[in-house]
């Protein structure tokens, strides 16, 4: 992946070591990926996505298969990327995660945008779960 993104060799090894260490993958990097658990494959995919230091990431359910420690680490990495001027679009069915991590929220139902905006505005005085359930009731 580092080759595909033309990450210089001098830069890639420190980045691989950094992210592998943070995601507890260091001792497993020499193993065949086919021997990895689902969670380890998810960590490797995240490491691969970060290796070229992107400004934009698009992630589909990035926390599925991760243990709580790895999920916490990934949340921190996502926040760091955004705090440094990057952006992340990610899908999740866990509304509490979206509420804690996201500055902007969009709720999509059957491929149609139902509501979007700053997290604080979308959730109002309730939670995202409250908003979602209310939207579901309105839809029925």
Where are these regions (language model features)?
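ABC transporter nucleotide-binding domains
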Residues: 1-90, 95-109, 114-115
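Hydrophobic aliphatic residues
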Residues: 2, 78, 123-126, 136
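Aromatic-residue hotspot detector
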Residues: 58, 132-135
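Conserved beta-strand-loop-alpha-helix hinge in the C-terminal portion
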Residues: 112-133
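ABC-family P-loop ATPase nucleotide-binding domain
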Residues: 139-140
């Amino acid at each position: 992946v580092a080759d595909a993104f033309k990450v210089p060799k001098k830069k890639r090894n420190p980045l691989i070591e950094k992210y592998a260490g943070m995601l507890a993958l260091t001792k497993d990097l020499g193993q065949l990926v086919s021997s990895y658990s689902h969670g380890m494959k998810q960590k490797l995919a995240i490491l691969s996505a970060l290796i070229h230091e992107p400004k934009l990431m698009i992630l589909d359910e990035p926390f599925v298969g991760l243990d709580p420690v790895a999920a916490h680490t990934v949340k921190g990495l996502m926040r760091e990327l955004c705090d440094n001027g990057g952006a992340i679009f990610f899908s999740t069915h866990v509304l509490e995660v979206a509420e804690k991590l996201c500055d902007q929220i969009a709720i999509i139902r059957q491929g149609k945008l139902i509501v979007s905006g700053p997290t604080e505005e979308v959730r109002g005085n309730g939670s995202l779960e409250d908003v979602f359930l209310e939207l579901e009731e309105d839809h029925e």
